[in-house]
Amino acid sequence: MSELLATYVLTHREDEQVNRKAEQIALGLTVGSWTDLPQLKKEQLQKHKGRVEKVTEKFAPAENGLYQSEVTIAYPEANFSADIPAVLSTIFGKLSLDGKVKLVDIQFSDRFKKSLPGPVFGIDGIRKKTGVFDRPLLMSIFKGVIGRDMTDLKEQLRLQALGGVDFIKDDEILFESPLAPFEDRIKEGKKILKETYEETGHRTLYAVHLTGRTFELRDRARKAAELGADALLFNVFAYGLDVMQSLAEDPDIRLPIMAHPAVSGALTSSPEYGFSHSLLLGKLNRYAGADLSLFPSPYGSVALPKKDAFGIYEACVKEDSVQKTFPVPSAGIHPGMVPVLMKDFGLDHVINAGGGIHGHPRGAIGGGKAFRSIIDAVIHGESIQEKTASCQDLKAALELWGRVVE
């Protein structure tokens, strides 16, 4: 019998019976009561009964004299259909209302994984699209675009591309606007990036923000593909993982999907309830089809604890039956962080910068060149001091922001 394993962290009083609570969860989310059932009913329902797989009691103290224990429960896959909404409703539906239970991991069976597409492109496919195989990718972000028209957006796009970035993404709060319509951003963006490629020989891809009502998204994404869009930025947690999966599975779309973590903080930030960062921004994003997953880095302006950030990274890149998702540590990234980013996340991640590019004293071109310069220095084992002597853009960036050293 195929089973799904769900692991929870329970926050509780020292004298609370954790094993009993685990049994209540296993039964309450499957067959309900058990001891009061007649034998015939038990035989009929046995294949639907949840069971406690493992309990690790009091592995960590919590605040206010409370403790935390870890519980793993096995759920028969016969209980739910092969989709993420059914899984989450079963293993964490009403249980999420408890307030002292955090879902930290899900282990899917090989049979169930066949219903989850994973990334269409993944790390390997994205690298083929960019033509970059030997370093982290560099991404920049449109900034201050609310209320601006296409003239301003085109100029921002051009300057960022001339700085040598590999990706440029829309701001996640840029929605459909008569000043900068979705389709115009794609068409005009393609023209600008074609021009910069012809000028520099460097290819930059543009991730346009897919927005609108849920039932409009598929048609808009298909239109984006028809117009030759490079990739889609998607606020997955405003819409739902299943919506992203449906976009990833559509053969008429076939565009890389960049999953933004907006809204996820409401689901992950508490140590006592919600989801773990690694599960939501890592594993579930990956299984639902995210080619790139953005998350706060451990060093920037909205820093995650290292354990959580590295947990997301591992969930994105560990070997599995689906392709790997490109991890994108973000928020407050500047050139002085690059050596630490590359030490901690290796080559297979995307360095994502907004203010670290636009806030450069020489503008977005200087910001991009500063990032590219320090990335190259780390790749080739050059000293940062020597590199700053030969690159004024990097020197200006480090004078402004300094270096993060561990």
From Swiss-Prot:
Keywords: Amino-acid biosynthesis, Isomerase, Magnesium, Metal-binding, Methionine biosynthesis
N6-carboxylysine sites (modified residues): K169
Catalysed reaction, written as an equation: 5-methylsulfanyl-2,3-dioxopentyl phosphate = 2-hydroxy-5-methylsulfanyl-3-oxopent-1-enyl phosphate
Classification via PROSITE patterns: RUBISCO_LARGE (PS00157)
Known partners and oligomeric status: Homodimer.
Function: Catalyzes the enolization of 2,3-diketo-5-methylthiopentyl-1-phosphate (DK-MTP-1-P) into 2-hydroxy-3-keto-5-methylthiopentenyl-1-phosphate (HK-MTPenyl-1-P).
Protein family (similarity comment): Belongs to the RuBisCO large chain family. Type IV subfamily.
Protein name as it appears in the record: 2,3-diketo-5-methylthiopentyl-1-phosphate enolase
Gene (name only): mtnW
